[in-house]
Amino acid sequence: MLPRGSRVRTRQEHALVGRSGRRVRAGSIVVHSVQTDVDGPPRAGFVVGRRVGNAVVRNRVRRRLREQTRSRLSSLPPGTAVLIRALPDAAGSSSADLGRSLDSAFRTVRSPRPQRSARSG
């Protein structure tokens, strides 16, 4: 389990990250990220819906994601909150596949967001 200070725990925090965060799809997961407070540690939350499978499968996917995230969370900037959502394909993914997906998503989260050019109308 992640330490208490490294978890996105409340419904309001989940909603904040899910709605206003940057969204990155990588393999069988989607990672929502938002920069919250600068001083706090990076935090993670997990969403594994019923479409992934029955309760046993969902809990297995959640445990795998949590374990893969634990070692990678420190690579994110301080104050970053991420919400990791498993897609139905995650049920058949190995821990190594989930780890590679997390690496790819976290690389994108760490990179600066490209500037949008102003549209002329």
Curated annotation (Swiss-Prot):
Record's GO cellular component terms: ribonuclease P complex
Recorded GO MF terms: 3'-tRNA processing endoribonuclease activity; ribonuclease P activity; tRNA binding
Broad enzyme group: hydrolase
Cited function: RNaseP catalyzes the removal of the 5'-leader sequence from pre-tRNA to produce the mature 5'-terminus. It can also cleave other RNA substrates such as 4.5S RNA. The protein component plays an auxiliary but essential role in vivo by binding to the 5'-leader sequence and broadening the substrate specificity of the ribozyme.
Quaternary structure note: Consists of a catalytic RNA component (M1 or rnpB) and a protein subunit.
Family note: Belongs to the RnpA family.
Protein name (database record): Ribonuclease P protein component
